[in-house]
A protein has these predicted regions:
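Active-site catalytic loop in hydrolytic enzyme cores
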Residues: 3, 9, 13, 30-101, ...
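CN hydrolase (nitrilase-like) catalytic-core segments centered on the catalytic cysteine
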Residues: 3-23, 90-170
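Recurrent small/Gly-Pro-centered beta-turn motifs in extracellular repeat architectures
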Residues: 26-28
Length: 170
């Protein structure tokens, strides 16, 4: 989709009507026809505050997506939010950069595969611990052909401890 599509406008309207902030992961095509794996930050007034484009592309993603080249901090009700997408979490420098730029919390919309559960567990906890920051990992759930995405979304405290988590396959 493009950033001004009806699809995105519906989410903006939802945020405004319900007074909520939304981090919306999606594929975005820019004005030069480049395609990015992105996340939009939509505020509770229904305005797009900005977007983050995934910087670390996994396996075959390079065939389809352009890599992003910057990390962004979003100020939401005086809370500084960073966003990483999925495989970005595997690179300590990304979370460290956001922390040094003042992030209070990092959200990580993801699509981790069941065979990588141990890495998901380690990365979410380690990035929180090494940066003394909250991590909210939101992992997709479901099956697509032979791809099993296991859920297990979680909130990690700055000590690397799991505060709350959904079970696998939820």
């Amino acid at each position: 989709v493009t950033q001004n599509s009806e699809y995105i406008k519906e989410y903006c309207q939802y945020a405004k009507n319900n007074n909520v902030h939304i981090i919306l992961p999606l594929t975005i095509k820019d004005e030069r026809e480049n395609i990015f794996n992105s996340a939009l930050m939509i505020d509770n007034k229904g305005k797009i505050k900005g977007k983050y484009d995934k910087t670390h592309l996994f396996l075959h993603e390079k065939k389809y997506y352009q890599a992003g080249n910057k990390f962004t901090i979003f100020n939401v009700d005086n809370i500084k939010i960073g966003i990483l997408i999925c495989y970005d979490l595997g690179f300590p420098e990304a979370a460290r950069y956001l922390t040094l730029k003042g992030a209070d919390i990092i959200f990580v919309p993801s699509a981790w595969r069941i065979q990588d559960y141990d890495i998901w567990d380690l990365n979410t906890r380690q990035r929180a611990l090494e940066n003394n920051i909250f991590i909210v990992g939101v992992n997709r759930v479901g099956k697509e052909a032979d791809l099993h995405l296991f859920g297990n979304s979680r909130i990690i405290d700055p000590n690397g401890e799991i505060m709350k988590e959904a079970p696998r396959d939820e």
